UniProtKB/Swiss-Prot annotation:
CDD domains: IHF_B (cd13836)
Organism (species): Salmonella typhimurium (strain LT2 / SGSC1412 / ATCC 700720)
Assembly and oligomerization: Heterodimer of an alpha and a beta chain.
Family recorded in the similarity comment: Belongs to the bacterial histone-like protein family.
Pfam families: Bac_DNA_binding (PF00216)
Name this protein carries in UniProt: Integration host factor subunit beta
GO biological process: DNA recombination; regulation of DNA-templated transcription; regulation of translation
One of the record's GO cellular component terms: cytosol
Gene3D superfamilies tied to this protein: IHF-like DNA-binding proteins
The keyword Magnesium belongs to this UniProt entry's keyword annotation: no
Function (record text): This protein is one of the two subunits of integration host factor, a specific DNA-binding protein that functions in genetic recombination as well as in transcriptional and translational control.
C-alpha cells in the first residue's frame, strides 16, 4: 500500500472528514516520525511496533558496474520491529 492509497482508504472510511484533512494528518504524522528518528529518539506504538535507529558499521563494498572495492562509512539506518499483536495478525497468511 502506498501513502496515497492509505490516504484514499482512510478518507473513504472516514467520510465525515474531508480528504484534504486526512492527507494533511497522514503527512504530518509521517513527518513527525521522521524528525523524531532524525533526532535519535525511538518511537513506540503499542500493539503495532517500534521504530529506532540501528548503527551499520563501516565495511568494504563493491561498485556493481566495475567490481572495484569501495569503502563505505558507518551510518545509522531506520529499523522497524513489529509488536506482538501485529506479528500475530500478519501470521494468518503464514
Amino acid at each position: 500500500m502506498t501513502k496515497s492509497e492509505l490516504i484514499e482508504r482512510l478518507a473513504t472510511q472516514q467520510s465525515h472528514i474531508p480528504a484534504k484533512a486526512v492527507e494533511d494528518a497522514v503527512k504530518e504524522m509521517l513527518e513527525h516520525m521522521a524528525s523524531t528518528l532524525a533526532q535519535g529518539e525511538r518511537i513506540e506504538i503499542r500493539g503495532f511496533g517500534s521504530f529506532s535507529l540501528h548503527y551499520r558499521a563501516p565495511r568494504t563494498g563493491r561498485n556493481p558496474k566495475t567490481g572495484d572495492k569501495v569503502e563505505l562509512e558507518g551510518k545509522y539506518v531506520p529499523h522497524f520491529k513489529p509488536g506482538k499483536e501485529l506479528r500475530d495478525r500478519a501470521n494468518i497468511y503464514g
